[in-house]
Amino acid sequence: MFLLSGYEYFLGFLLIAAAVPILALVTNLIVAPKGRNGERKLTYESGMEPIGGAWIQFNIRYYMFALVFVIFDVETVFLYPWAVAFNRLGLLAFIEALIFIAILVIALAYAWRKGALEWS
C-alpha cells in the first residue's frame, strides 16, 4: 500500500488552491489594458472629484476607542466557546470564566476612570 494514499484529496485541493490565484493573475495580465494614461492615476471617489487633501490628522482618541473595542472583542471570542460547552464543563471552568470576566470588568473600570471612554 502506498504511504500517501490518504492525501490525494488534500494534494488536489492544494494544487487547485495554488492554480486559481495564478490563473487569475495571468488572466489579468493578458486581458487588462496596457495603456498608462494620466486619467488612470487619478483618485476615484464614488464617481465624484475628490475634495481636499487625503492627508488629514486623526484625533488620537480614535486609537483609544479602537483599543478598548479590540480588548472586549477578544473577550467575546474567548467566551463564546465556553458558552457553547457550558453544560459539559464543570464548576472549575465556571469559576475560571468568572475570574476572566472580573479581570475584564476591572480593565473596563480602569479605562473608564482614566477617561479613555470620554471624548472631551
Swiss-Prot record:
It is an enzyme of class 7 (translocase). InterPro entries: NAD(P)H_OxRDtase_bac/plastid, NADH_UbQ/plastoQ_OxRdtase_su3, NDAH_ubi_oxred_su3_sf. It is found in: Cellular thylakoid membrane. Its EC number is 7.1.1.-. It catalyses: a plastoquinone + NADH + (n+1) H(+)(in) = a plastoquinol + NAD(+) + n H(+)(out); a plastoquinone + NADPH + (n+1) H(+)(in) = a plastoquinol + NADP(+) + n H(+)(out). One of its GO terms (cellular component) is NADH dehydrogenase complex. GO terms for biological process: photosynthesis, light reaction. The keyword Transmembrane helix applies. It is a multi-pass membrane protein. One of its GO terms (molecular function) is quinone binding. The chain crosses the membrane at residues 10-30, 64-84, 89-109. Coiled coil: none annotated. Gene3D superfamilies: NADH:ubiquinone/plastoquinone oxidoreductase, chain 3. Keywords: Membrane, NAD, NADP, Plastoquinone, Quinone, Thylakoid, Translocase, Transmembrane, Transmembrane helix, Transport. NDH-1 shuttles electrons from an unknown electron donor, via FMN and iron-sulfur (Fe-S) centers, to quinones in the respiratory and/or the photosynthetic chain. The immediate electron acceptor for the enzyme in this species is believed to be plastoquinone. Couples the redox reaction to proton translocation, and thus conserves the redox energy in a proton gradient. Cyanobacterial NDH-1 also plays a role in inorganic carbon-concentration. Belongs to the complex I subunit 3 family. PANTHER family: NADH-UBIQUINONE OXIDOREDUCTASE CHAIN 3 (PTHR11058:SF9). NDH-1 can be composed of about 15 different subunits; different subcomplexes with different compositions have been identified which probably have different functions. This is NAD(P)H-quinone oxidoreductase subunit 3.
